[in-house]
Regions:
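C-terminal soluble interaction/assembly domains
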Residues: 358-431
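Bacterial signal peptide processing site
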Residues: 21-23
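Short pre-active-site segment immediately N-terminal to the catalytic Zn-binding motif
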Residues: 162-179, 206-209
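Pan-zinc metallopeptidase signature
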Residues: 79, 251-370, 376
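Catalytic zinc-binding patch centered on the HExxH motif and its immediate surroundings
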Residues: 104-121, 136-162
Length: 431
């Protein structure tokens, strides 16, 4: 769980209150308690059993080392966070102030193995084919560059380590950052934030919803803390410090910036609604029964009853050819689609085209030189699906390497390819 500078600018500027074809897919009604699969033609390999969708193992060490005692200034912030959240720490928190250079090194070390690089390369190929990032984007480097310029602190639920940029005698802005991370630590002790790591891969939208819950709580709590503890002059200092940092580097595509900032923008509004409905206890209940889609975060009135259907794009690797391999599966939610539309359309049209989403997924394949992507999305009604299909056609413009298909009353399939030869093949197989 990380706090980013752009998030602080957005927070402080606002107000916080108390994916030859087979048969046409069949769309099941929106369930109220469990997900229903929506599948297309060809032989279906469920995403949840796909090798690309392995759950990330969580190894929380039994002994994470002595916590020690917090410096008095840190302890005071922790006590105030307890008061705002109506919770108490069950064990001491290890908090460490570090330099920017040390923070970047810690994050580099945590990235670790080659798997994140390989996964990012596959995602980059799929996203470039869809058209949300430029071709040739090094997504791993883009994320690293973004974090190196924007991350101000983090709390690691696996090691229970809290780190922020600052000193042991923190000023107002550093204490503001500390209050955010201390909220994560408090939530972790009561609700176990490693839940995020245990979510199976390929459940990207559900992960985004959970991150929005956690970051939303931390943002709201830190703002309430600032308003209670800081003087008017200190609040001005915090706002100035938040706005004085560097913008994201040019290596970071706009789509990625928006994707990474989403939890800090939509999450607080979701938390505000919970507070208005039931106070801090409603936030606690949300951690026990988290939102399962970014739709629920964007539309709190749809939480918790409006659950998504499970859309599974057929695995077309064998139909594409002997050299083709599956490279990526991603759950596509309202947030992702709204950000896609926002690259070329107005924010109003982006929101309208992605509203009343019911479920979605894309799958991507490559033979090394060519890439194919199929995105299936389910909608609450034919009207919503038709609006999405029309919006996608507008978004694609005169692109010759993509096709939008209305394949059911409330199901839309979009085909993307890296080149004309591949889109012709994909249309024959999946069109």
């Amino acid at each position: 769980m990380r706090i980013r500078r752009l998030a602080l600018v957005l927070t402080l500027a606002g107000t916080v209150t108390a994916s030859c074809t087979g048969s046409t897919p069949a769309v099941s009604p929106r369930p109220s308690s469990s997900s229903t699969a929506v599948t297309g033609g060809l032989s279906v390999v469920p995403a949840r059993s796909d090798p690309l969708c392995k759950a990330v193992p969580v190894h929380r060490p039994r002994n994470v080392g002595p916590a020690g005692s917090l410096p008095s200034v840190f302890a005071r912030v922790a006590q105030q966070v307890e008061q705002i959240r109506s919770l108490t720490y069950m064990r001491p928190v290890r908090a460490q102030a570090v330099t920017r250079a040390a923070m970047n090194q810690l994050m580099h070390d945590k990235a670790g193995s080659q798997e994140p690089r390989q996964s990012a390369a596959r995602t980059s190929k799929a996203w470039a084919t869809i058209g949300v990032i430029p071709r040739g984007t090094d997504l791993y480097k883009a994320v690293s560059d973004f974090d190196a310029s924007q991350v101000l602190g983090f709390y690691d639920p696996e090691t229970r380590r809290l780190v922020f940029i600052g000193t042991n005698s923190p000023g107002p802005f550093q204490r503001f950052t500390l209050s955010h991370e201390l909220t994560h630590a408090l939530d972790d002790q009561h609700f176990d934030l490693t839940h995020l790591d245990r979510l199976q891969s390929c459940r990207d939208d559900e992960q985004g919803a959970y991150i929005s819950l956690a970051e939303g709580d931390a943002v709201v709590t830190s703002v309430l803390w600032a308003r209670q503890d800081l003087s008017a002059q200190e609040l001005t200092q915090v706002e100035q410090a938040a706005g004085s940092g560097p913008p994201p580097p040019a290596s970071v595509p706009p789509f990625l910036v928006k994707l990474m900032e989403f939890p800090y923008e939509a999450g607080p509004a979701f938390i505000e609604t919970l507070l208005q409905q039931g106070g801090p206890g409603a936030i606690d209940d949300a951690f026990r029964h988290p939102p399962v889609s970014t739709e629920q975060v964007l539309h709190p009135e749809r939480y918790p009853s409006d659950r998504p259907v499970t859309v599974e794009v057929p695995n077309a690797a064998s139909k594409l050819g002997r050299r083709w391999k599956e490279i990526e599966i991603e759950q596509v939610g309202e947030e992702w689609l709204q950000l896609l539309f926002g690259l070329h359309l107005s924010s109003v049209n982006a929101a309208a085209n992605s509203d009343h989403w019911g479920g979605g997924q894309y799958r991507a394949w490559s033979d090394g030189a060519h890439t194919a992507v199929v995105m299936d999305t389910a909608w609450d009604s034919h009207q919503a699906s038709a609006r999405f299909a029309q919006g996608m056609r507008q978004w694609l413009g005169n692109r010759s390497t993509a096709t939008v298909l209305q394949v059911g009353p409330a199901l839309v399939r979009v085909l993307f390819a890296s080149d004309r030869q591949t889109i012709t093949l994909l249309r024959r197989i999946m069109g």
